Amino acid sequence: GGGTGLQVVIIGSGSGAFAAALKAVEEGATVTMIERQPIIGGTCVNVGCVPSKIMIRAAQLAHHQRAQPFDGIERSEPIIDRRTMLAQQIARVDELREAKYESILADNDNITLIQGSASFEDAHTIAVALNDGTSKKITADRILIATGSTPALPNVEGLADVPYWNSTEALFAEKIPEHLVVIGSSVVAVEIAQAYSRLGSAVTIL
């Protein structure tokens, strides 16, 4: 393929990074993947799509128990054990991360993972501050930045003085709050708002 013999560095280890790594290897390249977090997989499997869909589905079932539309089937208020729900959610996330990401590294000798923070020295050289406290330099023919996303905090006066959640903290909270205020109305905001409402919180969207 067109990538035969190329040394490729990919900064990040999410779905985009792995898709690029597999394609590069398919074309004959050798890939070094750099990830500064202690776990691989990026946003979707760890703190995004996967845990959110698990929580949304659980909340939907709670809602159906309370408000299903069929006469002759008794409706009842669900008993929510958030910690047990969360333990199952985390276990499923771990399972999918192993299946979709960790197993690829284990089965592919042409993809190497380095855990540390990357910085550019020049167009073809990456310096890596390794998580173990050491450092190394990597030279590459191609470098892909696939560092993904992180929650953005709005510039709201007084926000730093209150125990706010970002989307990740909302997905992994151990308790259902009595009242949740959601600032914003994006898809993520409304999904979280609906889930918490169905699990028993009073929810206000601003």
Can you annotate each of these PLM segments?
Residues G1-G5, K23-I176, T204:
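Glycine-rich flavin
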Residues G2-G14, I176-S186:
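Beta1/beta-strand and adjacent pyrophosphate-binding region of the FAD-binding site
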Residues L6-M33, A189-R198:
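N-terminal Rossmann-like FAD-binding beta1-loop-alpha1 element of flavoenzymes
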Residues G14-G16, T43-C44, V50, T150, ...:
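Gly/Ser/Thr-rich beta-alpha loop segments that engage phosphate groups in nucleotides
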Residues S15-A19, T84, L113, G184, ...:
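An amphipathic alpha-helix/helix-turn recognition signal
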Residues E174-L206:
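Rossmann-like NAD(P)H-binding beta-loop-alpha module
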